Amino acid sequence: MRIVLPHIVIRAVIAVILCLLVAELGWIVYGRWFAEGAKPDRTEYPLRGIDISRHNGNVDFAQLQQPGADVGFVYIKCTEGTDYVDPGFIENVRRASRAGIPAGVYHFFRYDTDGELQALNLLNAMGGRDFAPPPAIDVEDWGNPDGHTTALIVERLRMLVDCLVAEGYQPLIYTNIDGYHRLIRGNFDNLPLWISSFSWPPLDTDPDNRHWAIWQYSHRGNVWGIDGPVDLNVVNPIFEDRLFNGNRAQ
């Protein structure tokens, strides 16, 4: 005997399946952007800062310098790839300087372009200025194309780093846990690490917290002077002197 399911049952089954698919997609998005667990202890990590780009809009640095804002430094996006300069870079640097907030700059590293040309783009934009904290290189899969081998990515990143070092800059490497294990660990251990992580300890191979310089612990912070979410960071005290007392080789 053939059993014919009522249309209402079929619709209910389809609705359940769709709900499960939507829930799974939502969980993936939540995990990428919003799932944040550990928070740094304020007494252990008192020096806090943010990183910004044009996507953060018009930043009111006068508000950021207020004691209640709890912003002790700011990283400003400078360049990306071989020819892109963030439209807000110059003005953000000027405003940070006027507000007396220590400002570093960062370069978004592209997997698909030459490392030396990327270094030239960053160096030209910095114009020979010294920054404390020092320049950072943002290394992550997000925003980069697929299809590049680990060896090629590391080779291009090394070219970029070597060019900066040759000009007297001692850069940091910004990355997440996956990027650290795949690209940075064992290749750039001599450079200060800026790790993006939502767990404690921030770096799973560093339970004593002696190998990371900056910890980005949130993508959705709220601070005075910025409309919308902003990345939040803390400095590891054992790296504070190295980061904020000049980085150009003598």
At which residue positions do the language-model features occur?
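Aromatic-lined carbohydrate-recognition surfaces of secreted/lumenal glycan-active proteins
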Residues: L164-H181
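Functionally critical loop-and-helix segments that line ligand-binding/catalytic clefts
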Residues: G37-G57, F61-A62, F188, L193-Q250
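Catalytic-site microenvironment of enzymes
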Residues: R98-I101, G179, Q250
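Hydrophobic membrane-insertion alpha-helices, especially the h-region
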Residues: I10-Y30
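Glycine-enriched alpha-helix->loop->beta-strand junction motifs that scaffold or abut catalytic
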Residues: G68-G72, G100-I101, F131, N187-W194, ...
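Substrate-binding cleft of extracellular glycoside hydrolase catalytic domains
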Residues: R32-G37, D41-V59, Q66, I76-V161, ...
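Glycine-rich, charge-decorated loop segments at or immediately adjacent to ligand/cofactor-binding or catalytic sites
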Residues: D114, G179-F188
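N-terminal Lys/Arg-rich, disordered targeting/topogenic segments
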Residues: M1-V9
